[in-house]
């Protein structure tokens, strides 16, 4: 770092003389944004509670009536069938991916609950759940579990680029996002 050269007394006096009669200019062109509050991390206990709250909807005894012909699909009664068509065409790109390969049914339920909680918390509308082929247990159970959850609007077999018949694209109902209020 360079040392500042100090001005001689003569130069300082000359500078003061030249600056007499001047006034400070008020800065009015740049508006500074107010300081935003730091976003606090969600407590781990709360994350576990959200995961448990979302996974308790999944029952192995209840079998929702799903269309077994053709590709795996479901649309909630209050949701437009056009949303299902958009899912099928790949109009929605998933922002979160969940891979259930190698998990037990209980672990898969917990992970599905965690995915739904994360999507709602992060305002993610579309996610991809990869259940794989395997022994077809998770492939059969995953759509049945998803159809039971109240925040699942629709799901459809994923297009080839997202896993084809070994994955599902899921539309999740998220709360309306509100921007933070400025002080």
Curated annotation (Swiss-Prot):
GO terms for biological process: rescue of stalled ribosome. One of its GO terms (molecular function) is RNA endonuclease activity. It comes from the Bacteria. Residues 98-173 form the Smr domain. InterPro entries: Smr_dom, Smr_dom_sf, SmrB-like. It is an enzyme of class 3 (hydrolase). Its EC number is 3.1.-.-. Pfam families: Smr. Acts as a ribosome collision sensor. Detects stalled/collided disomes (pairs of ribosomes where the leading ribosome is stalled and a second ribosome has collided with it) and endonucleolytically cleaves mRNA at the 5' boundary of the stalled ribosome. Stalled/collided disomes form a new interface (primarily via the 30S subunits) that binds SmrB. Cleaved mRNA becomes available for tmRNA ligation, leading to ribosomal subunit dissociation and rescue of stalled ribosomes. This is Ribosome rescue factor SmrB. The gene is smrB.
């Amino acid at each position: 770092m360079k040392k500042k050269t100090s001005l001689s007394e003569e130069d300082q006096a000359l500078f003061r003389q030249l600056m007499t009669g001047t006034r400070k200019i008020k800065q009015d062109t740049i508006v500074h944004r107010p300081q935003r509050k730091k976003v606090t991390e969600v407590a781990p206990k709360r994350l576990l509670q959200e995961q448990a709250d979302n996974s308790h909807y999944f029952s192995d005894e209840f079998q929702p009536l799903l269309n077994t012909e053709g590709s795996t699909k479901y649309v909630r009664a209050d949701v437009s069938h056009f949303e299902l068509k958009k899912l099928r065409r790949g109009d929605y790109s998933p922002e979160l991916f969940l891979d259930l390969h190698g998990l037990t049914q209980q672990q898969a339920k917990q992970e599905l609950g965690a995915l739904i909680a994360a999507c709602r918390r992060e305002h993610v509308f579309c996610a991809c759940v990869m259940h794989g082929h395997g022994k077809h247990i998770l492939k059969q159970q995953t759509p049945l579990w998803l159809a039971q959850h109240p925040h699942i609007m629709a799901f459809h077999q994923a297009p080839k680029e997202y896993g084809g018949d070994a994955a599902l694209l899921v539309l999740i109902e998220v709360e309306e996002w509100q921007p933070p209020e400025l002080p």
